[in-house]
Amino acid sequence: MIMHLGLMMVVGLTLCLMHGQALLQVPEHPFSVVWNVPSARCKAHFGVHLPLDALGIVANHGQHFHGQNISIFYKNQFGLYPYFGPRGTAHNGGIPQAVSLDHHLARAAHQILHSLGSSFAGLAVLDWEEWYPLWAGNWGPHRQVYLAASWVWTQQMFPGLDPQEQLHKAHTSFEQAARALMEYTLQLGRTLRPSGLWGFYRYPACGNGWHKMASNYTGHCHAAITTRNTQLRWLWAASSALFPSIYLPPRLPLAYRQAFVRHRLEEAFRVALLEHSHPLPVLAYSRLTHRSSGRFLSLDDLMQTIGVSAALGTAGVVLWGDLSFSSSEEKCWRLHDYLVGTLGPYVINVTKAAMACSHQRCHGHGRCARKDPGQMEAFLHLQPDDSLGAWNSFRCHCYSGWAGPTCLEPKP
């Protein structure tokens, strides 16, 4: 079994380097908005139809959470991801060093083969948030438990080492095991479903959160975190897409929201090129509601999330929500009214504008992005009369196989 999986991984990595960016780079879709909300119950249980297709939003068949366009795998639903529960219970050994990599990969392979169709070409998102693969990134009480458990594990496994050597061994063994779990899982997914876009949710991180700071908030990513992102070259090499989070922090002032989103996306664009000759596609995760109040995002909020993502040149935005959105007929109607009245019209506007700019400036062989990322007023929007803009503030990011200022030059 071990040799078989190892061979599959090598073959899969070769396949994925050939096929890595097939999905959201077709000329017809320079920017996509993807639905990652389990809303199937609205139609099935309450008779409320959510017209996602008519609004230009990409969804799975039947609006199911897992399907041909997007599937997200949580910590307790995929392989043998090790973590500690809220009461300190160790699941799958608790720490990466304590889980069998071979058993994890065997179980993950079974789940991939049975949950994703053989022609799957959607987004495959792994949501593993309990620990960070670099030792120094596990700060705060929630994550420090993994450092403490690693030290205990090392003391049990290597009792002959002195305390300083045990601490060093805990550090290195944690990082080696964490890397193996994440790297081999991505390679396995890309082997078995090579047309899918595989990556981890919330990677890369940025560390530019809002903590009631003074008026000098810039939105820049924390220097220590950008350094760690550079150290994670192996993760970007194994990924075929990046899924950073642009969830707006509670009470983040409107004046700072664009800077918050922009710098998170710019960091993703930076790491997208670290291990690839052509950048990985970036699809930012956004929410439908504010975390603190539960209010739906306003039109201004949508501009600072979806609008900024399109203007900076991402491949798309993934809209996330949980089962609460479809938990009752009333909530389904609220979601319907928000879709039809606010979200849907804005998505139609942005996706049409992105397509028009792609064809007018980039000959349909690339997507438009701001010439100056900090030009806050430059958006891919249709005019109020639905006419096209001049797009003078945008340049082209060419798709793989094309080059030049307007993506007109074939590139082998």
UniProtKB/Swiss-Prot annotation:
InterPro entries, alphabetized: Aldolase_TIM (IPR013785), EGF-like_dom (IPR000742), EGF_extracell (IPR013111), Glycoside_hydrolase_SF (IPR017853), Hyaluronidase (IPR018155), Hyaluronidase-3 (IPR027260)
Gene Ontology biological process terms from the UniProt entry: carbohydrate metabolic process; cartilage development; cell adhesion; cellular response to interleukin-1; cellular response to tumor necrosis factor; cellular response to UV-B; hyaluronan catabolic process; inflammatory response
Lineage: Eukaryota, Metazoa, Chordata, Craniata, Vertebrata
Protein name stated in the entry: Hyaluronidase-3
SUPFAM superfamilies named in the record: (Trans)glycosidases
Induction of the gene: Up-regulated expression in apoptotic granulosa cells and in atretic follicles of the ovaries.
Alphabetical list of Pfam families matching this protein: EGF_2 (PF07974), Glyco_hydro_56 (PF01630)
Domain annotation EGF-like: ranges: 353-408
Disulfide bond among keywords: yes
Subcellular locations according to the entry: Secreted; Cell membrane; Cytoplasmic vesicle, Secretory vesicle, Acrosome; Endoplasmic reticulum
Tissue expression profile of the protein: Expressed in testis, epididymal tissue, epididymal luminal fluid (ELF), acrosome-intact (AI) sperm and caput (CAP), corpus (COR) and caudal (CAU) sperm. Higher expression in sperm than testis (at protein level). Liver, kidney, skin, brain, stomach and testis. Expressed mainly in granulosa cells of the ovaries. Expressed in small and large antral follicles. Not present in theca or stroma cells. Expressed in testis and liver. Expressed in testis and CAP, COR, and CAU epididymis tissue.
Species: Mus musculus (Mouse)
Cysteines paired by S-S bonds: 42-332, 206-221, 357-368, 362-396, 398-407
UniProt function note: Facilitates sperm penetration into the layer of cumulus cells surrounding the egg by digesting hyaluronic acid. Involved in induction of the acrosome reaction in the sperm. Involved in follicular atresia, the breakdown of immature ovarian follicles that are not selected to ovulate. Induces ovarian granulosa cell apoptosis, possibly via apoptotic signaling pathway involving CASP8 and CASP3 activation, and poly(ADP-ribose) polymerase (PARP) cleavage. Has no hyaluronidase activity in embryonic fibroblasts in vitro. Has no hyaluronidase activity in granulosa cells in vitro.
pH dependence, entry free text: Optimum pH is 7. Higher activity at pH 4 than at pH 7 in sperm.
Active site per database record: 129 (proton donor)
E.C. number: 3.2.1.35
Glycosites: 69, 216
Assigned keywords, A-Z: Cell adhesion, Cell membrane, Cytoplasmic vesicle, Disulfide bond, EGF-like domain, Endoplasmic reticulum, Endosome, Fertilization, Glycoprotein, Glycosidase, Hydrolase, Membrane, Secreted, Signal
